């Protein structure tokens, strides 16, 4: 086989989900040649692979989309409060095709290495087809929830049934009348359990850390609601982009204990009956995630709801969390009610841990063999940096990104890395916490401003513009993120993916900026568009 010739390209993007599509859209009019690759067979990223039953967004439909194309916002169809996986994938395909972005994409193609060449001031990128690309700008858009977390369960290969991770659900898997076990009760576990329970012969939920889940209150939207959204999108996006978490509703500035107890209860009931997980956290009160005493009152309210809904006291006990209400909240449409079904049971893995997989099921340490036809692993992701550190990315002086991040990922503004010139990350480690799409848009804007500056330098001086965060800026941004997290109870739960604690051996640390989307945008736009603060000067 003859070797492939090295190909020149201005911008090389890895990933074709929300991040890669959004970045390609933002760069489309700059006159740059763009190459986008993705290891998957089509665009869509997380929303291409997470096809498990019940998969849907926890963000309301009117703001789970790009803000940039107003005509598209007002005309593209959606008819429910929340989008299902097929609808999100269809939207991404539509957006890419409308803006002619597919022409730059190549699928079933993995990046094998990306190495900075100091002499030519370019990235040498090798891909699985055998080709090598040389790019002036290298952009990773691999997603923060894309590398599956596969648990180490003894003898799993001996199971004669079907094993399926929710992030890679087999297309032909039909669980009807099957004996199904589900390991994990995060968002995907809650959704798949609720969806499949009515159709399976039996469902056993293996739960170690039960989480708080709230009603999504999903429903069909009315024509009047869609008209309201269309007529107010300018105001909606302005408010959203200056908000704390960017979910499209006004966030409260009311402290929890400023309200008398009876009124507090009324407001919590209103949130339970009309809100969703994120609304519950921030719409009526401003300090549920920062005031531990307020959080405990909320926890008691939620625990009481579980006992009210789940009729079997033993099942209810196993479903009641003992931790703070301090994870990204899960929204559901009948999760707790599902446990009132006779065909649904629970194994508390703290009381009876998994010992091994057998040929016909799963054996727990109390000696019980739970016979199964299908084992579903709803065990989440090696989140945030998981995909970035599994490939060979080498910056200045032979510095490998994996080695640079051995004690946890670092960045400037979640988009730039000191020592890795002209490398950018769309919504990378220490990016904004909240609605993923506006967080992606903010990061894309920072990157685009930086590339525009570099191109202006190149046009003026005839030299390659080098965008590189300083070590001081990266260190300072890390402290900013640490300080913001100190105020947030999310940081107290060390076994969550926000801290890296869901992966054995992974360095613990803050992986997001909790200071607010509005603050994040203001800091990033000032640095990349106005002051160039935090970057090495151009030469």
For each of these PLM feature ranges, what is it?
Residues 178-200:
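Rossmann-like NAD(P)H-binding beta-loop-alpha module
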Residues 2-11, 16-156, 172, 185, ...:
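N-terminal FAD-binding dinucleotide-binding subdomain shared by FAD-dependent oxidases/monooxygenases
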Residues 177-178, 317:
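Short, surface-exposed connector motifs at secondary-structure boundaries
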Residues 166-168:
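Active-site glycine-rich loop that binds ribose-phosphate moieties when present
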